[in-house]
Amino acid sequence: HRPLSFGYTISLSSTVAMIQDATDHSSSPLLKVKLGGDDDRAAILGIREAAPDATLIVDVNEGWDPEQLRTMIPVLLECGVELLEQPLPAKLDEQLASIEVRILLCADESFYPDCSIQNLSPAFGCVNVKLDKSGGLTKAMQDMELAREFGLKVMVGCMVSSSLAIAPAFAAAQLADYWDLDGFLSLSEDRSPAMRVEHGEISLPAGLWC
């Protein structure tokens, strides 16, 4: 499998801590920023200033209400955010139709096992497929194929997990538009050999399953 550009996740924290995290990882080609805190505007503006060349993806984890989304859209556009993941609680998805987002929306919590893709809000142009959520690699690949049939882009995501779980997600991500595969970095101890992150890319180590 070809190496993939590596995306680093900036976890929701204080604005100062998030900007420092972005500064420390400003060379990463992609930053996935968790928002839904007390001062999202200052956080994303500071992160963009700290990492001017990084592609930015924002994940709100259902953390905004419709008015907060409307308020934040101009800020996200100013920062050049490429994708916005699950801004509203899934139960409020129908309200997305009345909001001019102008950024690619990705469904995560709204895209759950056995949900019907055709019942997703048409505001979504992307779905986050996680092997943990789909039930394994085979089902995840089927979910990806179905999403494509409905004209949706695909992100392959992950939970906090070892490199042994990231490896099949890495295989699926070869066919995805976006990927979020840094869950193994949150572990105090990973499997050895672990997934490799070098020069802004993530790749498989030799002998991962040995």
Predicted feature residues:
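C-terminal EAL-domain catalytic cores of bacterial cyclic di-GMP phosphodiesterases
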Residues: M141-Q142, L146-C158
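Histidine-acidic metal/acid-base catalytic patches
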Residues: T138, E149, E189
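Active-site-adjacent beta->alpha loops and helix N-cap segments on the catalytic face
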Residues: G36-P52, W64-T71, L88-E100, D114-S116, ...
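Glycine-enriched alpha-helix->loop->beta-strand junction motifs that scaffold or abut catalytic
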Residues: S26-P29, A50-A54, P74-E82, I99-L105, ...
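N-terminal capping/lid subdomain adjacent to the active-site entrance of alpha/beta enzymes
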Residues: H1-L56, G63-R70, V75-E78, R191-C210
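Flexible C-terminal active-site loop/helix
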Residues: G157-C210
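Long, contiguous hydrophobic alpha-helical segments, chiefly transmembrane helices and signal peptides
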Residues: L31-L35, C106-A107, N128, D132, ...
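Catalytic beta/alpha-barrel core
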Residues: T9-S11, P29-D38, T55-G63, C79-L92, ...
